[in-house]
Amino acid sequence: MTINSRKAINFKKLENIAIIGNGGRENALAWAIQKSDYVKNIFIIPGNGGSSNFKKCKGLDLDYSDTSKLIDKLIELNINFIIIGPEIPLANGLADVLRKKDFCVFGPGSDGAKLESSKSWAKNFMKDGNIPTADFWKVSSIEDAIPIINSSNSLVVKADGLASGKGVFIPENRNETLEITELILNGKFGNAGNIVVLEERLKGPEVSV
């Protein structure tokens, strides 16, 4: 994650913190941060039903996609530090917009967020940087996918864009691989499935870092 590099951070002065998002991730962040003696107020935007359950925490019913209203509210609340949780606002460049207004932000800019928001971009990044990764093919039509599927024994099928954690499939056979690929390309995940990544299936334990 990227923190605004134009200013040094004095954590003892991070009294008013804003957390962008409305999920369990944001609640977990608020729960951890409210334990700090330095923090006085945590505003979760827009938050959810549990956002006000922790001390120092308050949910604000505000649409963070309206950046003009968001910035006005952040200034009004004298926010010292902003954490952006969800992938979509990061991919859409919210961190970049806030940094241009000289806010201190924890979260990648839209360029860094591409590692999450576009699987094909991330795979090409790894390939160009000689970072070990499974072989892959990028397709935008079922006609392009068929010869790849027919010549491969075992593939993972992935919608290229953000699909709320539901865009990755591990088919059991070629027919299932073809069906899933066609389903994604036909709009199961909207624009997130305009491109499909067909990836070599690797065997072994899965580890997240």
Task: Tell what function each PLM region has.
Residues 81, 132-134, 155-157, 171-208:
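Conserved ATP-binding module of the ATP-grasp superfamily
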Residues 108-167:
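A conserved helix-loop-beta module that forms one wall/lid of the active-site cleft
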Residues 58-65, 137-141, 171:
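Short acidic-hydrophobic, aromatic-tinged amphipathic segments that line or gate anion-handling sites
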Residues 20-21, 85, 157-160, 199:
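Short beta-strand segments
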Residues 1-110:
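ATP-binding N-terminal substructure of ATP-dependent carboxylate-amine bond-forming enzymes
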Residues 92-93, 165-166, 207:
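Glycine/Thr-rich phosphate-binding loops of Rossmann-like dinucleotide-binding domains
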Residues 9-12, 35, 52-53, 106, ...:
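Solvent-exposed alpha-helices and their adjacent loops that cap or buttress functional pockets
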